[in-house]
């Protein structure tokens, strides 16, 4: 669209979000997005206030952004959640972009101006890890990059027959076929489970419940091998509490995996619902213990009734995932990033960054 054909967009402006914008932002979101985990306007407004105004990393220099149209009305929004990470053992500022939305009347330059304002902020690293194809194109056109490795999704079938049936088309025909196939599905999964090495059950070690303080201490040890890694700095209790409110994929479960000698091997956080796919929020382990940690994750999901486990790829885990027969796909969502510091961008490019779903926007539950 040429500038001549979009005079209204030319006179709009991007400004910092204020708490008194909440009603307008909630109204805009309810107009544009069909899915929400918070159906009432009051509940959604309260959640937006908590995330954008009262998170533990609030930074006046990293506000969420509003696009005002030529009439001074809220016509666009880009949420910003400041986070902290360390790069080569020194603190850096990170900004997570989320909930980009623009009213139909202002589409075109408005979204571009919001993303440009976000990427040119004072943060060392900008991240958005739920990008669709349109967002990816916009992001890259403004100088941002996509982490292809971190955008890969892996999946391990635990009950392969039930998983296949769950992906039949909807409607009466699909439901009827699924119902008729139940006896064969149960038999097929029983035979698959009996096959030697079918689930790769862990040999040794044990899993205990994962508390925020335990995770924080383990992260200090286990993540040291990454040049770029999260700095939770006392905020894990808040972060995990918010993540637990995400109910789309079931209950959030965490497990600390210990080696046979009691030493910490790693941990996992995943959402589990019986009969569904367990979605991994975070998976971490010492290089020598990754196979053990992955085995305990898969066993925990199987024991809780999941039919599959899926997560976002950490490149260093490829050998262990391959050994478990995990499938890979790269059809999005895209993990997008931008940094004005070449050395930080290089760490992302070469996979020397620990960036789990807990460290972006994926855990949010709007």
Where are these regions (language model features)?
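Residues that line or immediately flank small-molecule/substrate-binding pockets and catalytic motifs
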Residues: 81-82, 99, 104, 130, ...
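Conserved acetyl-CoA binding element of GNAT-fold acetyltransferases
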Residues: 91-104, 276-286
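Extreme N-terminal starter segment of soluble prokaryotic enzymes
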Residues: 12-13
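Amide-forming acyltransferase catalytic core, primarily the GNAT-like/NAT-type
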Residues: 3-6, 23-87, 92, 145-275
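Conserved acetyl-CoA-binding loop-helix of GNAT-fold acetyltransferases
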Residues: 99-121, 128, 288-300
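Active-site/acyl-donor-binding loops of N-acyltransferases
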Residues: 2-9, 63, 125-193, 243-245, ...
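Amphipathic alpha-helical segments in well-structured domains
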Residues: 94, 111-115, 132, 136
């Amino acid at each position: 669209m040429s500038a001549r054909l979009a005079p209204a967009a030319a006179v709009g402006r991007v400004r910092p979000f204020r708490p008194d914008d909440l009603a307008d932002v909630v109204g805009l979101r309810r107009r544009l997005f069909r899915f929400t985990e918070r159906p009432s306007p009051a509940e959604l407004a309260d959640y937006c206030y908590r995330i954008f105004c009262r998170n533990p990393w609030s930074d006046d220099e990293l506000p969420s952004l509003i696009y005002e149209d030529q009439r001074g009305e809220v016509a666009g929004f880009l949420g910003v959640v400041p986070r902290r990470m360390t790069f080569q053992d020194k603190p850096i500022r990170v900004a997570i972009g989320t909930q980009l939305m623009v009213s139909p009347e202002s589409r075109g330059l408005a979204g571009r101006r919001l993303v440009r304002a976000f990427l040119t902020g004072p943060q060392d690293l900008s991240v958005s890890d739920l990008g669709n194809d349109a967002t990816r194109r916009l992001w890259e056109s403004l100088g941002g990059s996509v982490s292809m490795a971190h955008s890969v999704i892996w999946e391990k079938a635990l009950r392969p027959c039930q998983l296949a049936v769950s992906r039949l088309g909807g409607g009466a025909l699909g439901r009827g076929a699924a119902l008729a196939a139940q006896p064969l599905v149960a038999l097929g999964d029983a035979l698959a489970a009996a096959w030697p090495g079918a689930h790769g059950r862990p040999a040794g070690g044990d899993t205990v419940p994962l508390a925020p303080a335990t995770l924080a201490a383990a992260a200090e040890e286990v993540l040291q091998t990454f040049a770029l890694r999260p700095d939770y700095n006392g905020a894990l209790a808040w972060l995990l509490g918010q993540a637990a409110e995400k109910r789309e994929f079931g209950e959030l479960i965490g497990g600390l995996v210990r080696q046979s000698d009691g030493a910490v091997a790693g941990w996992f956080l995943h959402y589990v619902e019986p009969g569904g796919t367990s979605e991994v929020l975070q998976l971490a382990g010492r290089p020598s213990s990754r196979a053990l940690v992955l085995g305990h994750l898969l066993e925990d999901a199987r024991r809780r009734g999941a039919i599959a486990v899926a997560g976002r790829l950490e490149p260093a885990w490829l050998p262990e995932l391959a050994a478990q027969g995990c499938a890979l796909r790269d059809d999005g969502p895209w993990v997008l990033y931008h940094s004005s510091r070449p050395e930080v961008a290089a760490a992302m490019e070469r996979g020397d960054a620990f960036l789990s779903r807990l460290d972006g926007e994926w855990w949010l539950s709007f």
